[in-house]
Amino acid sequence: STVMNTRSSDILKGPQWANVRALYKADGYAEEELGKPMIAVVNSYSTVCPGHVIFKNLSERVREGIQAGGGTPVEFGVIGACDGIAMGHKGMQYILPTRQMIADSIEAMAEAHRLDGLILLGSCDMIIPGMLMGAMRVNLPTILVNGGPSLPGRMKEGNPYGGEYIDHSIIQESEGALKKGLISEEKFKWIEDHAMPSIGSCAMLGTANTMGCLAEAMGIMLPGTAAIPAVYSERLSVGYKSGKQIV
């Protein structure tokens, strides 16, 4: 069979690279896996940011897709801070620098290990831009798989915006209404508990969803995938298809 010449094969073929193969085998990789394209799965999973909780399970489907496509997945993590949790206090000073840290991490890992392609798992404000910056630096085949938006909350009566649906952005507006005595504390608490009823990026026209749609328009995601809600099963199949496509 024909052996594909890749960046990773430059450090995996020949007796002079036995030490590298031994290290991968220590990770649990089989000999045959080391002759395939080595695809990075860049995972920003955490239980801090609701837009990133999904990646614990989604990354598994991505790895399965890479294997089905004839590649070998190599997963590593990057940070993913939540702008919403950091907002309104000193923590916000740390958010913008994380974009650079993410880009630096991707560049360092992809170049240090001579990886052949990237699957980027990210959803939120600084994470997608940081990932795209890192991908552009290394100039490798890249597909972004975002986590998708949260489902909206439902507020059948008393919605100050009208209509039936609400999202996380209504909470700050409601805080002002509470201070003015326009809504009760009970109503305010209800909004807090129901405005964001699932994991996913905040379901509003913010940076997270905007960057996801932009990445799709740029051709860095599979078509029609940016706005699939995080809790839909289709999200998992998108991960599999993206992993298979990158190879």
Where do the PLM segments sit?
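Active-site cavity-forming subdomains of large catalytic enzyme subunits
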Residues: 95-247
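Ligand-binding pocket scaffold of soluble enzyme catalytic domains
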Residues: 3, 63-69, 158, 165-170
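Residue-level signal for pocket-adjacent positions within structured domains
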Residues: 18-24, 43, 178, 196-200
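A short N-terminal beta->alpha junction/helix N-cap motif
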Residues: 7, 11, 29, 46-54, ...
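N-terminal amphipathic/basic leader segments beginning at the initiator methionine
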Residues: 3-33, 60, 68
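Long, structured ligand/cofactor-binding scaffold of large enzymes
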Residues: 32-146
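Short amphipathic alpha-helical segments with coiled-coil-like heptad repeat character
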Residues: 1, 50-52, 222-225
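Flexible, glycine/charged-enriched surface loops at secondary-structure junctions
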Residues: 6-10, 31-34, 70-78, 183-191, ...
